[in-house]
């Protein structure tokens, strides 16, 4: 009799426990579904590696990525109204200028980079080019060089900034215009990574890229002085002398991009279709043992911890991300 009673009580509590488990909030369930990310082309290889690692941890999530120039990525949201969860930019200012406040609330700065002049063994004067003569070689007849579109890709306007700063640094009046005179319009491509294949096939001699892209694609490159490579935040006052005008939020509008050290930014779009899974990816990506480690391994220095400019912005982040971020302008 007692044993039967104990069994019934045990069964009752077992059923209660089962109901309690089944009624747990959805937050305890693993994220699932599709996460759409628009990102800078220079992040393609590290994000490819992150995608594999993240999806192995969360088999129910399908991370779908679209690479483009950063401004082009932002305009997919602002102009084309394409569904998107996450946008990652090679210049955090693109998010500030084009997405905040209408399409995003915050902007996490997660990595840096620097510009280099890439080439291959097939390039003209490959055995001659160095940090002291590159600007002369780019002016030589028959040398084919290019950069990405400044209106679509930060690497494009940064390439122009490097040339402006080089004119000042080397004290060569008119150098900027002289170098550009040897670059036809057809050598400007929508995003910087498109220039990689032109270099590798020998159809282009030199191209401006981020150092991380050069490392990832095993390209040779000329490293530039900190004063002009846009890679050292301590040189921001010097970099600010360079200014490039690019297309703005609306047709016919323009905005000025002022020289500054290369800083990448990432945000969650306000009407993200799958916010839960998107935040799970961001939590993985911003972790020093997760996505930031992949960035570092692929030649791109991450900020550890990542940063936002104000405490107010930090307070608007999802709780899971706040612990991975510091306040630092």
Swiss-Prot record:
One of its GO terms (biological process) is molybdate ion transport. InterPro entries: ABC_trnspt_W-bd_WtpA, ModA/WtpA. Gene3D superfamilies: Periplasmic binding protein-like II. One of its GO terms (molecular function) is molybdate ion binding. Transmembrane segments: none annotated. The keyword Signal applies. Residues 1-29 form the signal peptide. The keyword Signal applies. It comes from the Bacteria. Pfam families: SBP_bac_11. Keywords: Signal. Belongs to the bacterial solute-binding protein 1 family. WtpA subfamily. This is Uncharacterized solute-binding protein SYNAS_25580. It comes from Syntrophus aciditrophicus (strain SB).
